[in-house]
Amino acid sequence: MRSIFIILIFLLFLSSCSEEKAQDKNHEEKQIIEHETQNNETSKATNQEAVNSENTTESIVPANDNNQTDEVSTPASQKQKNPAIKAVKVTFKVDDNDMVLGNKKSNVIVVEYFSPTCPHCAYYHQTIFPELKKKYIDTNKIAYVVREFIATKQDLDAAILARCKGDTNSFTQLHNIILIQQDKWAYSNKYRELLTDIGQLGGISPEEYKQCLNNDKITAILIANTNFVAKAPQFIGTPSFFVNGVQTGNYSIDTISTAVDKALEEQKEKAKNEMSL
């Protein structure tokens, strides 16, 4: 009986040892798995950093001498294919439909293209044109032609008003008022009513203005003026000026005066040469 009891104790001891070994083995396996997982995560993180580093490097433009503007890096052979734009001469035929100020017989013709709603045109008319007029128009040195560029319905209605009577004096008077009062009518929902009021200042009744708005001939002249200059190679908008067919760079008094003086001198030399023949 005693021997059986000893055997049972021994078996229980062996069983306990086996369980501890199994637990130790499981613990070791768990530690191995966790260690491998950590290694894998570390490896993934390292790989991701490498990818990010590569992507970042690709997105950075090296700051060296190769990072230059097209003007510097463009080969000379390629530049020759794109030479600077030269002045292009446009032939203008002045006719009875044109509003001409100054000397209609002058060989120096200055053509102004304007839009009634153009703020720069209004600025030119009030600040630069008076000096130009005094210097060249009032002295009958040039023929100054005023032509419209129609961009909006407001432009069309205002231009029709200025041309309603058809003579230069009426045009000049209404043209002046339209540009001086531009900020009052051009951007108003009631611009037609305001233009009608302006017309009355120039001696045009509401009924006359209404008839002019329905005058296809006036509209055709305005559209023809617009289409003609729109085809000019260097035309970029209003106001624009052409001196004997050559467009000026801008509308400053110095730029226009330089172009006009040059044209006058050329005509003077031409006349002198013709007399010597």
UniProtKB/Swiss-Prot annotation:
Domain (Thioredoxin) spans: 76-265
Biased composition of type Polar residues is found at 39-80
Q: GO CC annotation: what is one?
A: periplasmic space
State the disulfide connectivity: 118-121
* Record's subcellular location: Periplasm
Q: Give the enzyme's EC designation.
A: 1.8.-.-
The family classification in the record reads:
Belongs to the thioredoxin family. DsbA subfamily.
The name under which this protein is listed is Putative protein-disulfide oxidoreductase RC0029
Task: Name the species this protein comes from.
Answer: Rickettsia conorii (strain ATCC VR-613 / Malish 7)
The upper taxonomy is: Bacteria, Pseudomonadati, Pseudomonadota, Alphaproteobacteria, Rickettsiales
